[in-house]
C-alpha cells in the first residue's frame, strides 16, 4: 500500500474557499488502477503565521500505481487550473509519500 500526501498552508480566513475547491472539483481518481481512497484533512490553525494546515491524502495499491497516475492525462487534466488557487495558500504544497511496512 502507498500513501501520497500533499500538505498545504492555507491562508487564515481562506479555509472554506480552499475546501470548496476540493469539494467541487472534477475527480477521475476512481478511474485509475490501484486507487483506493481520497481524504482532505484539516489540521491545526497556526495563529503566529496565519495559516491552517491541510493535507490531501490518497491511498493506492502501490507506489507504481501512484506514479502511473502522476504521468496520466487524468492527472494533467485535474491539475490544469490549480495555479488559479494559489492565493488561497502560502508557498507550494509539500509532497510526502509513504510505503506501508508489511507485517507491522
Describe each region flagged by the PLM.
Residues 2, 50-52:
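Residue-level preference for beta-strand/loop junctions
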Residues 3-8:
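Active-site-flanking beta-strand signature of metal-NTP-handling nucleotidyl enzymes
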Residues 9, 41, 57-59:
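Short hydrophobic/aromatic beta-strand micro-patches
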Residues 10-18:
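Short, surface-exposed ligand-recognition loops at beta-strand->loop->(often short) alpha-helix junctions
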Residues 22, 26:
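Short amphipathic alpha-helical/adjacent loop interface patches that line ligand
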Residues 27-36, 51, 59-96:
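An amphipathic, aromatic/His-enriched active-site/gating alpha helix that lines ligand/cofactor pockets
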Residues 41, 96-103:
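Flexible, low-complexity linkers/stalks enriched in Thr/Pro that connect modular domains
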Residues 44-50:
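Acidic pyrophosphate-coordinating catalytic loop
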Amino acid at each position: 500500500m502507498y500513501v501520497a500526501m500533499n500538505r498545504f498552508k492555507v491562508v487564515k480566513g481562506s479555509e472554506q474557499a480552499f475546501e470548496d475547491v476540493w469539494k467541487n472539483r472534477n475527480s477521475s481518481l476512481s478511474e485509475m488502477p490501484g486507487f483506493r481512497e481520497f481524504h482532505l484533512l484539516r489540521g491545526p490553525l497556526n495563529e503566529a503565521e496565519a495559516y491552517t494546515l491541510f493535507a490531501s491524502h490518497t491511498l493506492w495499491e502501490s507506489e507504481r500505481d501512484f506514479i502511473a497516475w502522476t504521468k496520466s492525462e487524468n492527472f494533467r487534466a485535474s491539475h490544469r487550473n490549480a495555479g488559479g488557487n494559489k492565493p488561497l495558500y502560502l508557498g507550494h504544497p509539500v509532497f510526502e509519500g509513504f510505503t506501508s511496512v508489511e507485517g507491522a
